[in-house]
Amino acid sequence: MNYQKYHKLYFDVPPFARTWPGKQITSAPRWCSVDLRDGNQALFSPMTLEEKVAFFKLLVKIGFKEIEVGFPAASETEYQFTRYLIENDLIPEDVTIQVLTQSRDHIIKKTVEALEGAHHAIIHLYNSTSALQREVVFHKSREEIIQLAVDGVRMIQKYADDRFSYEYSPESFSCTEMDFAVEICNAVIREFAPTPEKKLIINLPTSVEVSTPNIYADQVEYMSQHLDRRDSVIVSVHTHNDRGTGVASSELALLAGAQRVEGTLFGNGERTGNADIAVIALNMFSVGIDPQLNLDNLEEIIDAYKKFNKLPIHPRHPYAGAMAYTAFSGSHQDAIKKAMDYCETHKQPYWQNPYLTIDPTDLNRVYEPILINSQSGKGGLSYVLETKFGLTVPKALLQEFSATIKIVSDGKHTVLEPEEIYDIFEKYYVNLKDKAELVDYHFKLAGEEAHLDANVKLCGKTRMLSAQGNGPLDALSNALRAETGKAFEIVFYNEHALEGSSSSKAATYIAINDTQGNMYWGVGIHPNINTSSVLALLSAFGKLL
């Protein structure tokens, strides 16, 4: 690869007293969704009017107070959508729509016409400022680019009134020399003459992401320190994801003085997309900061996104991906399971889980499935068997069972569904009949001693067994030893109800050792606890034959 073909497209930030590296995010910014413009223009099939209206209502429900609805002068569809929202009174009083415009008289005039009847709105003026675009696209000098922006401000002031707020973006800011970015933004600030009561938004986009997020943070803080009338300006950011760090760039920009973030749900947008506002907001949520957005029904938002944008969400997408709350690794599964068990028995003021930074139920999502493959361990198996089927399987049995699961999963080269896992568990351990099958039994207690009579098929032949012991299991063990000559000892016994009612089934786990120390496990499941114990012992003993 010829790396010498390339060079950095950003300009070094002049030396200044940066402060952002020592800061942390402590509160949510102003959010502005650009799904209906930046997002929509990047779709294979842009949304219809009806879909846009439904998406707008979704954004309002989520809690966005600023929503970019389009570029009314760019197409009749976007103009009509803006009019539809206004004429049908679909914009809540506390929500401000935002519209884009270029610095041309007829475009600005139509933009303002589109806003007729709106209680308030943001008119967003932009023009490109990067050295590359000035040279190869517009063939204009710095002075001409500044004049273009100033002329745009004057045309807006000619047509608009005091109902509106204003935003200016030096498009391709991330590829613009810092001294020129400061110069053009301050020229716009002087022309708009904002006040602390009526602030101007200066939006600093990475129209194309060309640097690491720390460079962008330096650019933002440098601008924040050098803008005129800083108390009358809202510094906004609009990051793209060309290098895969759109979210990080927005987050570091907040440390660097940004007060507002533009982005889209799940990062839709041109090329590799915009910053994902849902991820930024949930990152804040995960450290105890109120994001000021309602993402507690994430599944509904995901479904709407897929429906309106006709785009999938990557299964590994943070928070929203189908596999965001799954674990294949055995050690991860074990840690998740232990943490959830600990939280059940030790009430904590905060969510604590080694691999789940947010409780999925807070997003109307679920822990399942913990997915089982050849890399999974006993923690994942324990979770699936307990949560899906009510089986609290002993650790030693899980260890043995996990080896079986690895063999099966390796052979299938795929993930095992919970029902498949249970079927395998049942096949190898539960109520086995291959070599030791219960036909019927009867026992009675006489003082501390139990007498047992049982019909049992041993290797296909029915045997009538009778013996005494200090309980049904001890009596059956004595009978099996006497009948077969096989010596063994019960080394583990545990039982529990599968459900909480008196009519529920019982599960019994038994392990036996032969004279060589080999261990054999059996599980019995039956409505009667004594019968489940007998079945468990016979399941284990059959493996000894």
At which residue positions do the language-model features occur?
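A mid-to-C-terminal "edge-of-domain" accessory segment
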Residues: 1-37, 288-466, 502-505
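Mixed-charge, glycine-accented linear interaction segment located at domain edges/termini
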Residues: 518-521, 525-545
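Positively charged, aromatic-enriched nucleic acid-contacting surfaces
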Residues: 452-456, 498-521
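Short beta-alpha connecting loops at secondary-structure transitions
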Residues: 204-206, 262-270, 282-294, 363-370, ...
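Alpha/beta enzyme core
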Residues: 3-6, 31, 47-65, 82-88, ...
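N-terminal capping/small domains of soluble enzymes
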Residues: 1-104, 364, 369-376, 382
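Short, small-residue-enriched loops and turns at beta-alpha junctions
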Residues: 38, 42-43, 72-76, 130-132, ...
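Catalytic alpha/beta core domains of metabolic enzymes, predominantly
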Residues: 208-344
